[in-house]
């Protein structure tokens, strides 16, 4: 069977050259006579893999020296707990900006550890926009402020990162890390599950300023303490070695594409193809505030559930798969991460045009 265009929100499409290299090296990595999946994480071979992955991420994101890159497990969802356990150490209070389902889940976990202040929310607008933050991030006595830079389910993103001068800014970048340029120095902590733009499921990346490490409560479990990973080069226990290896290959691929600035321009072009059609369409609509449209996750719908289902079925027959929207939003959603080629988006738009002509 030919490969399809996979618009899944995660686990998501990986670059074909990466998959082909994985296939080539699967049973015999670098002449070792064994697979990465069989290799000791204490071996020099794996040490070079994790070091290269860290160095590539530092290079691609221009990460300052005062930050650690940590390779973790448990997904972004475990970070919802790790963050307050490690950072709620002075005021026992944190600020959260609610912009979607995932930011709400992050807040709910933080409430189990300390006090949470909702700084701003777009929930009344059904998370179709990003709330204004002007003047809301002042001299509050907070241990950190948490945002979600891209809302995978709702299809919104921050256009400008809020300025927080006296409080560490924590960002969930799971669905748009490496898709556009960010100034890492504006953040105290960035985290992301790998399964959208970095690699396969099983790996979580954390980029954390070192002065935020070491403040966890003494009751914090060892495996939930950032210091454990920082002191042990993310090798305190067996890491998700295969996921780290594939992520390294994805980072190499991204560098070959010209880095983050080049992929950002391509992502803008891909998303514009779809948004331009949606803006002109008489059948399909997008629920998102145009100012805050995501480059990565694009929800859209037709006037009826019957048409939505027909669209999805015929799309699948054309090799355009995993377009069903999240159950909380409905309709369709096209996730067009870094690895999605321009021709994949163009084929989707071409099909949408044909479907509209058939259903005038």
From Swiss-Prot:
GO molecular function ontology, one term from the record: O-phospho-L-serine:2-oxoglutarate aminotransferase activity
CC cofactor: pyridoxal 5'-phosphate
Sorted UniProt keywords: Amino-acid biosynthesis, Aminotransferase, Cytoplasm, Pyridoxal phosphate, Serine biosynthesis, Transferase
Binding site for L-glutamate: 42
Short name of one Pfam family: Aminotran_5
A GO cellular-component term linked to this record: cytoplasm
EC number: 2.6.1.52
Any one Gene Ontology BP term: L-serine biosynthetic process
Residues with N6-(pyridoxal phosphate)lysine modification: 196
Domain of life assignment: Bacteria
Xref: PANTHER family: PHOSPHOSERINE AMINOTRANSFERASE (PTHR43247:SF1)
Family, similarity comment: Belongs to the class-V pyridoxal-phosphate-dependent aminotransferase family. SerC subfamily.
Protein's job: Catalyzes the reversible conversion of 3-phosphohydroxypyruvate to phosphoserine and of 3-hydroxy-2-oxo-4-phosphonooxybutanoate to phosphohydroxythreonine.
Protein name (Swiss-Prot/TrEMBL): Phosphoserine aminotransferase
Organism listed in the record: Bacillus cereus (strain ZK / E33L)
């Amino acid at each position: 069977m030919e490969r399809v265009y996979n618009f899944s929100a995660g686990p998501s499409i990986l670059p074909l050259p990466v998959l082909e290299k994985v296939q080539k090296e699967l049973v015999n990595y670098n002449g070792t006579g064994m697979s990465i999946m069989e290799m000791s994480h204490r071996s020099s071979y794996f040490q070079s893999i994790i070091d290269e992955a860290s160095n590539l991420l530092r290079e691609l994101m221009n990460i300052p020296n005062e930050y650690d890159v940590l390779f973790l497990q448990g997904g972004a969802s475990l970070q919802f707990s790790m963050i307050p356990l490690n950072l709620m150490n002075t005021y026992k209070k944190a600020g959260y900006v609610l912009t979607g389902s995932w930011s709400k889940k992050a807040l709910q976990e933080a409430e189990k550890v300390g006090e949470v202040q909702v700084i701003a929310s777009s929930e009344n607008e059904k998370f179709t926009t990003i709330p204004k933050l002007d003047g809301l991030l002042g001299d509050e006595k907070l241990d950190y402020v948490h945002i979600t830079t891209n809302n995978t389910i709702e299809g919104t993103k921050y256009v400008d990162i809020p300025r927080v001068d006296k409080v560490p800014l924590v960002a969930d970048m799971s669905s748009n890390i490496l898709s556009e340029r960010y100034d890492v120095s504006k953040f105290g902590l960035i985290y992301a599950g790998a399964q959208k733009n970095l690699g396969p499921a099983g790996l979580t990346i954390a980029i954390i300023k070192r002065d935020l490490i070491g403040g966890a409560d003494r009751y914090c479990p060892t495996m939930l303490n950032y210091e454990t990973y920082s002191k042990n080069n993310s090798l305190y226990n067996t890491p998700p070695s295969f996921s780290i290896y594939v992520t390294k290959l994805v980072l190499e691929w991204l560098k070959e594409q010209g880095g983050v600035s080049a992929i950002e321009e391509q992502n803008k072009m891909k998303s514009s193809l779809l948004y331009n059609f949606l803006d002109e369409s008489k059948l399909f609509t997008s629920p998102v505030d145009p100012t805050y449209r995501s480059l990565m996750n694009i929800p859209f719908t037709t006037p009826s559930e019957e048409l939505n289902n027909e669209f999805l079925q015929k799309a699948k027959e054309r090799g355009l798969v995993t377009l069903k929207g999240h159950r909380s939003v409905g309709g369709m959603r096209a996730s067009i991460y870094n690895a999605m080629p321009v021709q994949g988006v163009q084929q989707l738009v071409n099909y949408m045009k044909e479907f509209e002509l058939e259903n005038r």
